[in-house]
């Protein structure tokens, strides 16, 4: 009815486009819920690699012909379409996991960075006289902040429109160890991991620095040193960030379960 009686063709077109995107997102989220519900015991006992989750979601979309075009007769091979939508679904849930309406916030999913190994977290906890579970929770959140920023890539080629949908910009997001306040000033796509340093030598606090200071009861210099150490030893360690050149990095989904 809206499309029939709208005073503006532009508004009608926007509404139709919005409803199509919203329905596609609903189908993707429903697919994730179905796969998790069917496999939750196995996933809890043996956390799945992101690639495996995408494969299972692809199979579900394929078997249901979820993204078939209107008039589909059931003969067209939809695997490529199913796989693209599976990747969009998973990337979207990872990047938006802190939203109150995300499947992670609803307790259906949880993404874990593989670099925060138990022995590393135990060492940090001992060094700073903290509980291991508190340290693990802190660094799990800090690693996910890179994902929330959007410095994340999966094993798929995304169009500009798809990137806009997931990351809110077609330009790939990136992160670096420490942003240069002059050279990187206009790079809105780029996040700094540790605090930037002002010309007078003082630190420009970011959210990560404040969080480390609060949880571990550290002064800003010690907290920033720990962030830089974590970058060097963990984020650039065995489960490393991937390089995009120019000292800019991103997470591959291979680093998560």
For the regions a language model picked out, list residue spans one by one:
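Charged, low-complexity interaction segments
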Residues: 1-257
């Amino acid at each position: 009815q809206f499309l029939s009686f709208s005073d503006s063709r532009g508004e009608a077109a926007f509404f139709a486009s919005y409803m199509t995107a919203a329905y596609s997102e609903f189908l993707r989220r429903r697919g994730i819920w179905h796969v998790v519900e069917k496999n939750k015991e196995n996933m809890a006992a043996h956390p799945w690699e992101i690639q495996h989750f995408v494969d299972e979601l692809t199979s579900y979309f394929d078997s249901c012909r979820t993204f078939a075009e209107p008039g589909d007769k059931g003969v067209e091979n939809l695997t490529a379409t199913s796989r693209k939508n599976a990747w969009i679904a998973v990337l979207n849930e990872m990047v938006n996991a802190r939203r109150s309406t995300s499947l992670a916030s609803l307790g259906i999913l949880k993404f874990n960075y593989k670099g925060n190994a138990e022995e590393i977290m135990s060492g940090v906890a001992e060094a700073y006289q903290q509980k291991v579970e508190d340290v693990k929770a802190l660094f799990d959140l800090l690693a996910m902040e890179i994902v929330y920023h959007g410095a994340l890539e999966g094993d798929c080629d995304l169009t500009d429109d798809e990137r806009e949908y997931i990351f809110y910009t077609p330009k790939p997001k990136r992160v670096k160890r420490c942003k240069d306040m002059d050279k990187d000033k206009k790079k809105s796509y780029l996040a700094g991991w540790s605090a930037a340093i002002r010309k007078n030598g003082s630190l420009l606090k970011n959210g990560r620095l404040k969080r480390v200071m609060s949880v571990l009861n550290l002064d800003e210099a010690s907290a920033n040193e720990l962030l830089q150490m974590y970058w060097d030893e963990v984020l650039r360690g065995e489960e490393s960030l991937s390089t995009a050149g120019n000292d800019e990095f991103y997470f591959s989904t291979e680093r998560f379960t």
